[in-house]
Curated annotation (Swiss-Prot):
InterPro entries referenced in this protein's UniProt entry, alphabetically: Cyt_b/b6_C, Cyt_b/b6_C_sf, Cyt_b6/f_cplx_suIV, Cytochrome_b_C_euk/bac
Domain of life: Bacteria
Protein name: Cytochrome b6-f complex subunit 4
Molecular-function annotations in GO: electron transporter, transferring electrons within cytochrome b6/f complex of photosystem II activity; electron transporter, transferring electrons within the cyclic electron transport pathway of photosynthesis activity; oxidoreductase activity
Family per record: Belongs to the cytochrome b family. PetD subfamily.
Gene: petD
Keywords: Electron transport, Membrane, Photosynthesis, Thylakoid, Transmembrane, Transmembrane helix, Transport
Known partners and oligomeric status: The 4 large subunits of the cytochrome b6-f complex are cytochrome b6, subunit IV (17 kDa polypeptide, PetD), cytochrome f and the Rieske protein, while the 4 small subunits are PetG, PetL, PetM and PetN. The complex functions as a dimer.
Ranges annotated as spanning the membrane: 37-57, 96-116, 132-152
Source organism per UniProt: Cyanothece sp. (strain PCC 7425 / ATCC 29141)
Function summary: Component of the cytochrome b6-f complex, which mediates electron transfer between photosystem II (PSII) and photosystem I (PSI), cyclic electron flow around PSI, and state transitions.
A Pfam family reported for this protein in Swiss-Prot or TrEMBL: Cytochrom_B_C
Predominant localisation class: membrane
Cellular component, GO annotation: plasma membrane-derived thylakoid membrane
Length: 161
């Protein structure tokens, strides 16, 4: 027989009272202040900075090929963080529609908190709609960004087909 796990009702006054008293929470272990914030975090931050500086000194990598003012590249690409919107403008036949689609991105991001606001859980596995929308948006943005680096005829298939 399968065991049914009941989800807690966070609007229940009895449960709220128990949580307010401290029931259901762990109060053991090492406190974050001052141990983590004063000792561990600076070590991690300084270690990360030392790693970046050390790698830059040991193996300085070129950011790209040197600029040649007398040769114009065949295709001018924007910075990497603008690849998805550049791909939208490149692929959509009507430029006004492309601008409207780019303007709809912030509007879509503003709607994300309202998609599944009735669900009080924070665990992504208990919020399937919000998790699915987030994963779809992330994969779609990556697909657009990677496609922007290909020629226009191969940008939809990413050169795979």
């Amino acid at each position: 027989m399968a065991k049914v796990q009941k989800k807690p009702d966070l609007s229940d006054p009895k449960l709220k009272a128990m949580l307010k008293k401290g029931m259901g929470h762990n109060y053991y272990g090492e406190p974050a202040w001052p141990n983590d914030l004063l000792y561990i975090f600076p070590v991690v931050i300084l270690g990360s900075i030392a790693l970046c500086v050390g790698l830059a000194v040991l193996d300085p990598a070129m950011v790209g090929e040197p600029a040649d003012p007398f040769a114009t590249p065949l295709e001018i690409l924007p910075e990497w963080y603008l690849y998805p919107v550049f791909q939208i403008l490149r692929v959509v036949p009507n430029k006004l529609l492309g601008v409207v689609l780019m303007g709809s991105i912030p509007l879509g991001l503003m709607l994300v908190p309202f998609i599944e606001n009735v669900n009080k859980f924070q665990n992504p596995f208990r919020r399937p709609v919000a998790t699915t929308v987030f994963l779809f948006g992330t994969l779609f943005t990556l697909w657009l960004g990677i496609g922007a680096t290909f020629p226009i005829d191969k940008s939809f298939t990413l050169g795979l087909f």
